[in-house]
Amino acid sequence: MKYDLVIFGGGTSGIAAAYTASKLGLNTLLIEATDVLGGAITQGLVVPVMKLNNDGINTDFYSDLLEFSKKYNAQNTFSDGNTGWFNPELLKLVFDDMLKTVNCNVLFSTTPSNITFNEHNDNFTIDLKHKILSLHIETQYIVDATAFGEIFKILNYNFQEKNNLKQACSLRFNISNVNLKIFSAFLMEIDNNREISPIYETKEGIHLSTAYTWDNDKPWALAPLFEQALQNNDLKANDNAYFQLFTVTGMPNTVAINAPRIILDDFEDIQNPFTYSNALIQGRERIYRLFNFCKKYLKGFENSFISHISDTLGVREYCRIKGKYTFTKEDVINPKTFDNIAFACDYPIDIHSNNKKNDELTYLSKTCYVPIQVLICEKNDKLYGIGKILSADFEAHSALRTQMSCFSMGEAAAKDIFNKINN
């Protein structure tokens, strides 16, 4: 079997690339290691999609995603105009529907066992493994959207050098049977800051969010409750590092919790399988403490229960490829002019550190424009790396890694490949 384009990884960037390429008429195959598309959204419970100014650059996929989601009542628009309040379960159906509509080939539970680039034929030969069966395919182009650079590793291409800086991981979870009427009244009583704790009445009910972190840069209304829980030994050290709460579209009386922050020692590498596995165990243990904290300290949670724990660890950064251009912190803060822009972004430099002193949230005064070269392998024009593995330094990566940017990266890569094939 021969394809124009094979994409590995059916997360946010991979889906966007597959959908766009197929819509443009390329013979496209999307390969996903699990049994569901969506990655961080559907398996990691990462909702809502964070709002940013993308300047309308490579946003066609996202516009279509909104239209498909409305068919399933899987999307809502929050009071601040953020259209990214999705239902993570229903998006599993939405993504299938989108790819089926554009006749994209999809293989689930499939992984690469070997990949070779043939310089003479200028294409890739790929051996795939599905359960106990094997497949052999060929393709002109590959897009690595695996989040951990699996294809770059197999082909032995370079990554950015490691340093001691690292992002903390998380393991999200949902709590259901929350009395949102009581909880919203409780929030109104303790927090008059509607930027931190916005509350919004919609036709489907109450939508809200709130937050607390161990940083002292904002007047966190939940701070006294976390401090009391620490004193009472209801929470342990670092359980209070980061806590965000959102209601979920189409899930009445359910809230999504962006916590716990999983703290790794300086010498630990999340790519180590033992470190990764221990992080999951630590995360689930701490989820139960945070759940009991909510039941005891937050009004409206008295009869609640844990309804879903993320199926995958929330890793903000595994590795970063070496592309034809490496985007830097300076490029984010003082934007340059580039040809062939892949996406625009004004999301802050957002570093979730292992300790307070290295946390950073630096808002941008200008929108930065990211060139397609950060998505192309430095040594092979036919290999792209998109999503969380884009070519950037540590600080720039923290601003560029969000889901909205990942959607645009996938779309940009697909369009660039289409143009190369047709020229």
Residue ranges and their predicted role:
Residues 116-136:
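Conserved beta-strand-loop-beta-strand element in the redox core of flavoprotein oxidoreductases
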Residues 20, 26-27, 32-114, 168:
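Conserved N-terminal/central alpha/beta ligand/cofactor-binding core
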Residues 10, 33, 388:
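Cofactor-binding loop segments of dinucleotide-utilizing enzymes, especially the Rossmann-like FAD-
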Residues 4-5, 28, 383:
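Conserved hydrophobic helix-helix packing surfaces used for dimerization/oligomerization
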Residues 1-11:
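Beta1/beta-strand and adjacent pyrophosphate-binding region of the FAD-binding site
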Residues 40, 135, 139-141, 145-422:
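Flavin (FAD/FMN)-binding glycine-rich loop and adjacent Rossmann-like elements that form
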Residues 14:
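N-terminal Rossmann-fold NAD(P) dinucleotide-binding loop
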Residues 6-8, 22, 120:
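Membrane-embedded transmembrane-helix bundle of lipid-linked glycan/lipid transferases
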